[in-house]
């Protein structure tokens, strides 16, 4: 069975490696198949998100990247997309750079989306949620399992981070 968490972890590790080669200091919220919630958390997902926010603050991150893969009942949906929160104007600036790079490199027709997710409301660290494609789309599911495509996605994100910090 192909699961989002496994592909996302591989993409994230590749992204970490590429960013570190560029001189970035990278903190991963996970490097194994585990979440950040504790056994005492009644609401497991909320506990995981809360601990991620604490990490952003603890490490005084300059940017956070939340990597995901979409899934939708319509299997023809495809393409990478970027979600941001309007609380911090830097979120939209970075999101625009990244979405434009996804459009150029992958031909993604999706648009930058504004969102109001829990994590974004509770941190001042600039960042975005990145949907690398659709696991529900057979073509993208096939591609996202390939190491070469994971490297390509990571390169697009890395190049976007570099552009963001150079501007």
Segments predicted by a language model, with ranges:
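Catalytic-core regions of hydrolytic enzymes
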Residues: 1-80, 84-94
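Sec-exported extracytoplasmic/periplasmic mature domains
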Residues: 13-24, 31, 57-61, 99-108, ...
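Short, low-complexity, polar/charged sequence segments that are solvent-exposed and flexible
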Residues: 46-47, 83-87, 101-104, 147-151
């Amino acid at each position: 069975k192909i699961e989002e968490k496994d592909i996302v972890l591989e993409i994230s590790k590749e992204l970490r490696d590429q960013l570190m080669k560029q001189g970035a200091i990278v903190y991963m919220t996970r490097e194994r198949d585990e979440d950040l919630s504790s056994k005492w958390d009644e609401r497991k997902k909320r506990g995981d998100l809360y601990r991620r926010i604490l990490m952003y603050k603890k490490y005084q991150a300059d940017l956070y990247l939340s990597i995901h893969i979409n899934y939708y009942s319509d299997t023809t949906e495809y393409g990478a997309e970027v979600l941001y929160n309007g609380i911090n104007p830097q979120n939209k600036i970075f999101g625009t750079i990244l979405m434009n790079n996804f459009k150029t490199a992958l031909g993604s027709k999706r648009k930058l989306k504004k969102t109001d997710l829990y994590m974004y409301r509770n941190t001042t660290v600039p960042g975005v949620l990145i949907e690398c494609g659709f696991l529900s789309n057979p073509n993208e599911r096939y591609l996202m399992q390939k190491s070469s495509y994971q490297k390509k996605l990571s390169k697009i994100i890395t190049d976007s981070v570099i552009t963001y910090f150079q501007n």
